[in-house]
Amino acid sequence: MDYIVGFVSISLVALLYFLLFKPKHTNLPPSPPAWPIVGHLPDLISKNSPPFLDYMSNIAQKYGPLIHLKFGLHSSIFASTKEAAMEVLQTNDKVLSGRQPLPCFRIKPHIDYSILWSDSNSYWKKGRKILHTEIFSQKMLQAQEKNRERVAGNLVNFIMTKVGDVVELRSWLFGCALNVLGHVVFSKDVFEYSDQSDEVGMDKLIHGMLMTGGDFDVASYFPVLARFDLHGLKRKMDEQFKLLIKIWEGEVLARRANRNPEPKDMLDVLIANDFNEHQINAMFMETFGPGSDTNSNIIEWALAQLIKNPDKLAKLREELDRVVGRSSTVKESHFSELPYLQACVKETMRLYPPISIMIPHRCMETCQVMGYTIPKGMDVHVNAHAIGRDPKDWKDPLKFQPERFLDSDIEYNGKQFQFIPFGSGRRICPGRPLAVRIIPLVLASLVHAFGWELPDGVPNEKLDMEELFTLSLCMAKPLRVIPKVRI
């Protein structure tokens, strides 16, 4: 009903806009047949529409590696092969480095101080430099290593109290990721494990903002309507963000009053670099939001695949028992001796990249990609989900086979375009050095400490792996398991 009301209310406005400002671009990439005004939108929202990622895969196979889609009055380009991704993220990295935030994220004053949604201007360069050289530097990550291990241990200890029960891990994995980020940001846990809580804490607010960002918004497809906030998403996002600020503003004020001469976390670093309160709030939100959601989703996917494939799980357990031992706990110092663990994480990211359709790169100036003309102002998306499942680059692409990475030189650095879970080029995810530490640490801790069974006698091979894509890619049905003690 929400869709119908939205389309009826805007049809006349859209028609007028279409007639007055009909695009005159030529030499665009190929495009499937489209409806007048609404473009390809009905292909996504009709009753029999396939899931979005399946739809994107199908049309890429039919129309080629670079396609042009029109959702309402918003046109976008989608790159779905490693060759197309290379031209977008490497050849045209600079000219395709712009950003256009989703309407619901355009809340003042946050959007004016955003790094994630900023064009590659001087403020963006300063923020990215601080993230790379200080906050996610080797030195600071090493200094926080024990905190990450303690956070992973706390998760294991809590699950120990649930041994034999049917549990959903998702909220606890999300909270664990939040606590890791809490120590990155201001050296504190921000989530407490509990069975039930009605308290609206940081976890619920951040999760709420992520859900709001993934909701249907007619303004995303008909930009002329953005000012009206027809679904109330921008208002809702603003309310949630203000509540988040209240949680950490006391810590920010206290640190300003007592500056740390040797910065130990993000807050210290930002204060030392004279960031104002709006800049700090924006940086905090863009650390907690994307980092908690993507990291926890990957861990859930990895554990689900291992449960579904008992031979892979047994192989990983054998490696952990041999290297870590049954009387010890997993440490980051073990990583260099755990190649199969690393292969399991990479294979999970190949199948389920953290951001399956990357945040769009806005074209700053008209450019050429694969012989096609991309006009100034158009958004270009890279489909990492399709690239990671391309049969030209991956044998049996839909199978979970960590072994494919054991004798491979493929890394997370975005240089090999068949595997770009964190993106590539100047817009590569700045939190990558943290993610490749916390994901294997938590996954290994869960596999090492527990045996896992599916409830109701469901065979492992019948585990439901249906995907749900919003801002990120998660399991459509949260993983429900029964933990059994191993160590």
UniProtKB/Swiss-Prot annotation:
Enzyme class: oxidoreductase
Binding-site positions, heme: 429
Any one Gene Ontology BP term: berbamunine biosynthetic process
Organism for this UniProt entry: Berberis stolonifera (Barberry)
Stated name of the protein: Berbamunine synthase
CDD domains the record matches: CYP76-like
Entry function: Forms the bisbenzylisoquinoline alkaloid berbamunine by phenol oxidation of N-methylcoclaurine without the incorporation of oxygen into the product. Oxidatively couples either two molecules of (R)-N-methylcoclaurine to form the (R,R) dimer guattegaumerine or one molecule each of (R)- and (S)-N-methylcoclaurine to form the (R,S) dimer berbamunine.
Keyword annotations from UniProtKB, A to Z: Alkaloid metabolism, Endoplasmic reticulum, Heme, Iron, Membrane, Metal-binding, Microsome, Monooxygenase, Oxidoreductase
